[in-house]
Swiss-Prot record:
One of its GO terms (molecular function) is NADPH binding. It is found in: Endoplasmic reticulum. Its main location: endoplasmic reticulum. This is 3-ketodihydrosphingosine reductase. The active site is at residues 182, 196, 200. Pfam families: adh_short. NADP(+) binds at residues 196, 200.
Length: 334
């Protein structure tokens, strides 16, 4: 045990000295595209980004009414602020585009519109924030729900990224930054989310692959793992969420989308690859790193065995909740 601890400490020190974190992304003066920015986390993210003296922000969503509300609902303390880059209302920096992101042709056309409208055609940062979930029991859900979830949560982000990456490569050697909003369900499998977890795991896999593949082009990445967040989508989820899923998720407690949005902006500026809001999710990120940058630098090595132990305990607790709910349902059938 002592040898293991000493070895871990030595490895941690070496990693701390050798490992180089990706450079933080400067938002000031940048053109940002937010996919899925008409409600929830995405909408709050638009307002938080406006505080960073960005040049402009293009918001993509399917509902035109919701897109208009992004402009109309902009908080006065944000959208009436004067900045060196834009004296007057910051509302003028918001551009809205109605698009069904599950349609790759429409996505291609929308990105082309955004490029043509912005001088120079630059897109400096892409934030993929669209997604939804329909919780339920695997044996009771139709295959169409799995397909629909994957189409929006994964392919919607893929289509936008596929169009934006070539623009970033041609961005005069400046590269860019791409954010994928995954979920805590993209780090661990949660009973009741068999339609949702695979789509969020897929985003992690895409980001992990592109982080290395596009490194020569100075394109950096962040993956966000929000916990349950009090959004319109979350309220809809609760209509079909199994009892054990509620218990495993913390009894139905949800965090503010504003707080999650703030953590995303902070993570982008800090150069964080993994962006998590709460401690449990951060520990899950340490437990499931893949071939990605460290979360806590050398502390990742020290925390790994502890996180694994906590993970086993959590797994057993989840299994107990599932069994408890299963027995309860069977009793009601009698």
């Amino acid at each position: 045990m002592i040898i293991y601890i000493l070895f871990s400490l030595l490895a941690a020190v070496i990693v701390h000295l050798v490992y180089k974190k990706q450079t933080g992304f400067k938002l000031k003066g940048k053109h940002i595209v937010v996919v899925g920015g008409s409600s929830g986390i995405g909408k709050e993210l638009v307002y938080e980004l406006l505080k960073e003296n960005i040049a402009s922000i293009s918001v993509i969503s399917r509902s035109l009414d919701k897109l208009r509300s992004v402009v109309d609902d902009c908080p006065s303390e944000v959208c009436t602020k004067s900045t060196p880059l834009n004296v007057g209302s910051l509302k003028s920096k918001i551009e809205i585009y109605s698009c069904d992101i599950t349609n790759k042709i429409k996505v291609k056309e929308t990105i082309a519109q955004i490029v043509s409208k912005n001088q120079g055609g630059k897109i400096d940062c892409l934030i993929n924030c669209a997604g939804f979930a329909i919780p339920g029991y695997f044996i009771e859900q139709d295959e169409e729900i799995f397909e629909k979830t994957m189409q929006l949560d994964y392919f919607g982000s893929l289509y936008a990224t596929k169009e934006v990456v070539p623009l970033m490569i041609e961005n005069g050697g400046q590269g860019g930054h791409i954010v994928f909003v995954s979920s805590t369900c993209g780090l661990v499998g949660v009973p009741g989310y068999s339609t949702y977890c695979p789509s969020k795991f897929a985003l992690r896999g895409l980001a992990e692959t592109l982080r290395s593949e596009l490194k020569p082009y100075k394109i950096t990445f962040s993956v966000v793992y929000p916990p349950d967040t009090d959004t319109p989508g979350y309220q809809q989820e609760n209509l079909t969420k199994p009892e054990e899923t509620v218990a495993i998720s913390g009894g139905g407690k949800a965090v503010s989308p504003l707080e999650v949005a703030k953590s995303i902006v902070s993570g982008i500026k800090n150069g964080d690859y993994h962006i998590a809001y709460d401690v449990p999710t951060k520990l899950c990120a340490v437990l499931s790193p893949g071939l990605t940058p460290f979360y806590f630098s050398f502390f990742d090595i020290l925390l790994a065995p502890i996180c694994r132990l906590v993970g086993i305990i959590a797994m057993n607790q989840n299994d107990a909740e599932v069994l408890k709910s299963w027995k309860k349902r069977n009793q009601l059938k009698k």
